[in-house]
Design a protein with these regions (language model features):
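N-terminal signal peptide c-region/cleavage motif recognized by signal peptidases
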Residues: 4-6
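Interaction/scaffold regions that mediate signaling and macromolecular assembly across diverse proteins
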Residues: 11-243
Length: 243
């Protein structure tokens, strides 16, 4: 599906390294659960945030997309470490809109980073790779997104999210699909790709009977309440080894 991206720069350009962020999340993210206190003390994390500030040249659009996904996820963590939280209405305003970061020589907030930079790249599966530090978000991966395997990573993230019963459920008897609000908020992205939200989900759901019904748009859709509680240990938490 990434074939739509076009090469934007010379193939010999050096690709931005996400190794520092890989070091951080491989240590401090377990099955989507984030150890924020540990990340706050991790020098590799703060070094990575610093490297994001300067302008980067992208080898191609796939490289660009992987860069922005990693940048978003890293900055979403920073918002929590800076004492912000999307759990309440005013918290969301502060977390997504008021908090600004320097990334790729731009000053930008998380909302604009997602809506003005990432979504226009035309890849709907990014909605299952981006994590905004909340329980109902797609689980934060403990692997950075890389251009050379981005297709496989996005496929995996999409399959995992859609088939997670805590995020999406399908009742064949009543033909009711209980879906994540992500499919409501970003409906246009899925419609542009597959015609309908149900058609998009049908491509990834593993139950053949559910997939066939979705492909025929047979389900009534109801959206599940989104859980905005933190997806990990709060940054102010004192762990046992600190007592």
């Amino acid at each position: 599906m990434l074939h739509a991206f076009s090469v934007k720069a010379d193939q010999t350009e050096q690709i931005f390294s996400h190794d520092l962020f890989q070091s951080v999340i491989s240590q401090h993210v377990k099955d989507g659960f984030v150890d924020y206190p540990a990340i706050k003390k991790n020098t590799d994390y703060h070094a990575y945030i610093s490297t994001l500030e300067t302008a980067s040249q992208f080898k191609n659009s796939i490289d660009e997309l992987s860069y922005w996904i990693n940048a978003y996820n890293a900055l979403a963590i920073k918002g929590i470490l800076d004492g912000r939280s999307p759990e309440t209405f005013f918290g969301k305003v502060g977390y997504f809109y008021n908090a600004e970061y320097k990334v790729n020589d731009k000053i930008i907030n998380l909302y604009d980073l997602e809506h003005d930079i990432i979504i226009p790249l035309g890849e709907p599966r990014i909605h299952f790779a981006l994590n905004c530090a909340s329980a109902s978000c797609p689980k934060l991966s403990n692997e950075v997104y890389q251009a050379d395997k981005l297709e496989q990573q996005l496929e995996h993230a999409t399959i995992i999210f859609i088939n997670d019963n805590s995020r999406n459920r399908f009742d064949l008897k009543t033909k009711t699909a209980y879906l994540s609000k992500i499919f409501d908020w970003f409906e246009d992205d899925f419609v542009k790709h597959s015609g309908t939200v149900q058609n998009f989900i049908a491509l990834y759901v593993t139950d053949e009977h559910v997939s066939n019904a979705l492909a025929n748009n047979e389900f009534q859709i109801k959206y599940l309440e989104y859980n905005w509680s933190l997806n990990g240990t709060p940054p102010g938490h004192v762990t046992e080894d600190e007592n």
